[in-house]
Structure formats: C-alpha cells, structure tokens
Amino acid sequence: MNYYMEIKTEIINNEITKKIKDYSKNKSDLTTYYNVGKLLSEAGKHYGEGIIKEYSNKLSKDLNKKYSVTTLSYMKQFYESGIFQPLVGKLSWSHYLQLLPLKDKDKINYYIDITLKNNLSKRQLCERIKSKEYERLDDKTKKKLIEHK
C-alpha cells in the first residue's frame, strides 16, 4: 500500500470538492441576490421605494441577520442592471458591486471578460476600472470587441 499516494489523492479530492462547493455557493448566492433584486424591483413599483427600508427592518428582525438598505438596494440594482448571466456566475458578488455603477453594456462586458480571462481579484478589477482601461482603448479595438461577442 502506498500511503503517500492515498494521502495525496485524498487531499487533491478535498481541494476539488471545496472548489466545486465554493463555485456552487457563489452561484447560489448570486441567483438569490438576483431573485431578491427582482422582487424588490417589482415591490418598489407597487409600493414605492420606501419598501426597501421597510423590508430591511423586517428581514433583519425575522432572520436575525442584518439586511441593510444598502445591501438590498444593491440587489435591486443588480437585477435591474441585467449583467447577471449564467456564465458570469463565475464572478463574486464583490466583483459585481464594482460593475454596478457602469452603465455601458460594452464596457461591462469588457471588464467581465478581462476579469474571467485574467482571474482578476476584486481589487485588480477596481484598479482597471479606475484607470479607465476600457475608455483608453481605441475605437477600432472597441469595435472588434463588440463584433467578437
């Protein structure tokens, strides 16, 4: 019996399982945030924007967990932005929060693509956005990126 190989295999299998669980949890969280955002958006149309504050208080009380107005507003904005797609589920919530202020879909798609291709951290993505990397691309390059989609 080769104990080393069994130990190594056990550790590798555990790492694979953790990665799968992390991805699944992230995707589940994002789907939940999207669905909550959709409901908040619809509720806002019926009851006004003050409903977010009311729901924040109720959720915090009922679930014994703080659901701030800001967090719920981000969820609503996340839904309304339309940037959540199954493939993009590979990004974390903190990545999405960096993308929410952007309004141009081509710009958003550019930053999503570079984040996925380069495995950028939230901080690295933020730096690229702040440096206006997309805006510094020439029009010809931007056109190619759009056509490539």
Give short role names for the model-derived ranges.
Residues 1-149:
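Basic, low-complexity intrinsically disordered segments
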